[in-house]
């Protein structure tokens, strides 16, 4: 599980604890550096699949990782952030297709993000459905670019931007392993 790199929303919200009103933000320069560092940390793992949330910050992180590791990106709505801030208003599919023409978005509704705030129960259920599904796949060879809320729902942990955790979806009782911490300068 990879938390996307830093965005301007993250930077401002961390400093003020107020929603700065930025919709579907891009990564900052620091966030792009975090994504490149994550790619380096992932290289020895021999990944075969890269899943990303459809939010721009996750796709941009995934694109940097995919370019460095030679992986295709698969978009999944199920690993998106809990919808509760302005940054969780996504981009229309036409914009996503124009920016990432090699990524498939045809399976998503437009708009693909919720219309109302999601409860913690909703994102927890979504994370558990994802956990059950990924158990049937080659999960050791799969990386998922996702968000603070989804990682928290799945693991109970809060992690900084650019952090990589290894989870065993078949063992929800097992603590995730920290592969890389994005919490450095």
Model regions and ranges:
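Acidic, low-complexity terminal tails and accessory targeting/binding regions
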Residues: 82-102, 138, 152-185
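Active-site-proximal alpha-helix that buttresses catalytic centers in soluble enzyme cores
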Residues: 5-75, 99, 161-162
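Phosphate-handling substructures
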Residues: 11-12, 16, 21-26, 68-126, ...
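Short coil/turn segments at beta-strand junctions that form active-site/ligand-binding loops
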Residues: 46-48, 138-142
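Short beta-strand scaffold positions
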Residues: 52-53, 125, 145-146
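A short, acidic, amphipathic alpha-helical segment used as a generic capping/interface helix at domain edges
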Residues: 123-137
């Amino acid at each position: 599980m990879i938390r996307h790199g830093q965005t301007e929303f993250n930077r401002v919200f961390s400093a003020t604890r107020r929603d700065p009103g930025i919709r579907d933000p891009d990564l900052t320069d620091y966030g792009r550096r975090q994504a490149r560092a994550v790619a380096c940390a992932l290289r020895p793992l021999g990944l075969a699949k890269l899943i990303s949330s459809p939010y721009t910050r996750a796709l941009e992180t995934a694109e940097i990782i995919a370019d460095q590791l030679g992986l295709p990106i698969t978009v999944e709505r199920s690993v998106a952030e809990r919808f509760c801030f302005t940054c969780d208003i996504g981009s229309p599919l036409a914009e996503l297709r124009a920016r990432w023409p090699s990524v498939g978005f045809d399976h998503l509704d437009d708009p693909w993000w919720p219309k109302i705030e999601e409860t913690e129960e909703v994102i927890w259920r979504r994370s558990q459905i994802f956990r059950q599904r990924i158990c049937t796949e080659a999960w050791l060879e799969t990386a998922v670019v996702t968000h603070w809320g989804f990682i928290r729902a799945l693991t109970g942990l809060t992690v900084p931007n650019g952090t990589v955790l290894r989870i065993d979806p078949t063992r929800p009782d097992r603590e995730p392993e920290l592969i890389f911490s994005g919490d450095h300068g």
